[in-house]
Amino acid sequence: MKSLNDVNKGNDVKNQPVEEMNTKPEKIDFSKVKVELLFEEFVDFDTFSKSDFRAVKVKDCVAVPKSKKLLQFTLDDGTGTDRTILSGIHAYYEPEQIIGKTCIAITNLPPRKMMGIDSCGMLISAVHKEGEEEKLHLLMVDDHIPAGAKLY
């Protein structure tokens, strides 16, 4: 799997000469990381299997006007029709950092209107705290995975 260190804000490698780029993965001190407790309630397999997780390719990503948090994604979900998903991750990513990436989405959620735009699904992210600072990492996978590939 490719390193995703270059997609987070503050890790801009686009303008660095190759010689200056650090090819070793960033070391993370996990002793300072806090994660939410696991759910104590179990979900049966039939309920879980109703969620349709798919690989999606980010064709375009723009900031939603008049919103500080929302990004609007135009996604290839393998159906031949663009899918729009809005996500409140602008504090963690700039739109241009995500274009061309392969992400994971739940595609069978009912449309939800946000800022007047229908969001048709949800992108999957990992969230944790380092000290008091919340961190979010959009789940991205190998670009060799085709749009529409189902996750089990």
Regions found by a protein language model. Name each.
Residues 1-152:
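Phosphate-backbone binding interfaces of nucleic-acid-interacting proteins
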